């Protein structure tokens, strides 16, 4: 069957990483869907990298990537959380 779990990670890796799945796709509404053991985090919606509040990829080293609907629009300081939210609204309403 499809990997799926409501209310917690569907996979808890031996190294301490965690993955949230819904209907077989990486997905989480209220946080990163993939938390690596080193602290790196990735936000997914229905299997694609996506985050409206900030970067969809946040690495402990400080590296960031800005994604919407599985398309990368920037990295690191191309946006900050405020400018990203403004940009996302222009994408949605264009």
Predicted regions and their residues:
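Glycine/tyrosine- and acidic-biased, solvent-exposed loop/turn segments at the edges of beta-strands
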Residues: 2-94
């Amino acid at each position: 069957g499809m990997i799926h779990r409501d209310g917690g990670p569907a996979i808890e890796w031996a190294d301490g990483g965690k993955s949230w799945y819904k209907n077989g796709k990486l997905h989480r509404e209220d946080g990163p869907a993939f938390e690596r053991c080193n602290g790196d985090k990735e936000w997914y919606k229905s299997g694609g990298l996506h985050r409206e509040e900030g970067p969809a990829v946040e690495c402990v080293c400080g590296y960031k990537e800005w994604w919407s609907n599985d398309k990368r629009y920037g990295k690191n300081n191309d946006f900050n959380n405020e400018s990203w939210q403004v940009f996302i609204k222009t994408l949605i309403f264009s």
